[in-house]
Structures are given as C-alpha cells and as structure tokens.
From Swiss-Prot:
The active site is at residue 168. It comes from Francisella tularensis subsp. mediasiatica (strain FSC147). The keyword NADP does not apply. This is Octanoyltransferase. Transmembrane segments: none annotated.
Length: 206
C-alpha cells in the first residue's frame, strides 16, 4: 500500500473543503498519494445526494449545503471530529462495501480501545451507535475508483441542531457524543486515534 498523507485542516468552512475534495479527486493521477483530511466545520447542514427536503424541519438560519455524498441530511459543527478519506480504492483493491465496513470498524475499535465504550452498528442505518444513540455519521462517494467524504464523530459539541432535522432521514433519532461519557473529550485526540485505527485496519485488509 502507498503512504497515506495526513493533513490537519483545522476549522474550515464546509463548502471550501468540499470544493477542495472535488478538485483533488478529479486531478489526482495513478501515482497520487492517498490522503486523510482532519477538519472541524462551523455550523452547517449537509444534504446527501438523495436527501429529502422534508427531513430539514427548521434550519434556524444554519446554512444548508447540497453535496454528492451518500445518505440524507446531517449536521456538522464545532466540537465534531470530521475525517475525510481521499483514497484510490481501486489501487488498494478495496471495494466500496469493504471501505464502509472499515470506516465503521475503525470507530468501534477506537471507542473501545481509548474510552472503553462498546459501540455498535445498526443494519440498514449506517453509522456508529452507543446504546442505540448515534455517535458517528458517515457518508462517502466513490467516483472512478476514488473515494472522498468520510465520517463525523460527535466529540464535544452542541447537539441541539440535530433536533432541527431528521438525522440521516430518521425521525426522532437520538444523538450522543463522546463528552457524554468522557468530559475531557478532545477532537484532535479523537482524530488522531481514529486515523491510527483506520490505517491499521486498511493495511491489514490488503
């Protein structure tokens, strides 16, 4: 496997990072290194390519951005650890389903290893849950064997805006965050811990 370059973008507007992902993916060559971007976004709702407007109950003036990722509407905001995967999955001999399961399993492993939290998935409702409350959302896009978008892990944030929508298209879905279980939850640590688990799983799968 080629080296994966890791870049910490800090706090960035969603639209800027989305445009950068599109440009990176469209201009990369077979020799381009894979990258993982670590980022935090100001408050924004993002609507997946099959997202339904009725799942946004009241935006409360929070911006809404249409994207080309999978899934329905979700919320990003300060205190949420976001990780984007810009990978050549064809070169890595990694199918779309395997990528999704690796993204999910890395989060489950991280929560267990570093925080002693037993997380799980729910069939038909992608994401990571603790006691059936969603702690992480994921949405990916694969174009010509190249992936972008990623996972958002609720870490230490205001969860209120999730009540303004039907998260991921599910009415009444309860959300949680790492700070509910670990008061000193820090997004930088979560991003590094998650990335380490993801890369380990990725290397073991190819």
């Amino acid at each position: 496997m080629n080296n994966i370059y890791q870049e910490d973008l800090g706090l960035q507007q969603y639209t800027k990072v989305f445009e950068d992902m599109l440009e990176f993916t469209s201009t990369r060559t077979p020799e381009t290194n894979d990258e993982i971007w670590l980022v935090e976004h100001p408050a924004v709702f993002t609507q997946g390519k099959h997202g339904k407007p009725e799942h946004i109950l009241n935006s409360h003036n929070i911006p809404i951005v249409a994207t080309d990722r999978g899934g329905q509407v979700t919320y990003h905001g300060p205190g949420q650890a976001v990780i984007y995967f810009l990978l050549d999955i064809k070169r890595n001999k990694l199918g779309a389903k395997k990528l999704v399961t690796t993204v999910e399993q890395a989060c489950i492993n991280m929560l267990d290893k570093y925080y002693n939290l037993k997380a799980h998935i729910i069939d038909g409702a992608h994401g990571i849950y603790i006691n059936n409350q969603k702690i992480a959302s994921l949405g990916l896009r694969i174009k010509q064997g190249k992936s972008y978008h990623g996972i958002a892990i609720n870490t230490n944030m205001d969860l209120t805006p999730f009540s303004y929508i039907n998260p991921c298209g599910y009415s009444g879905l309860k959300m949680c965050q790492l700070a509910n279980f670990y008061q000193e939850a820090d997004i930088k640590k979560v991003q590094q811990q998650y990335t380490a688990e993801f890369v380990t799983l990725l290397n073991n799968s190819i």
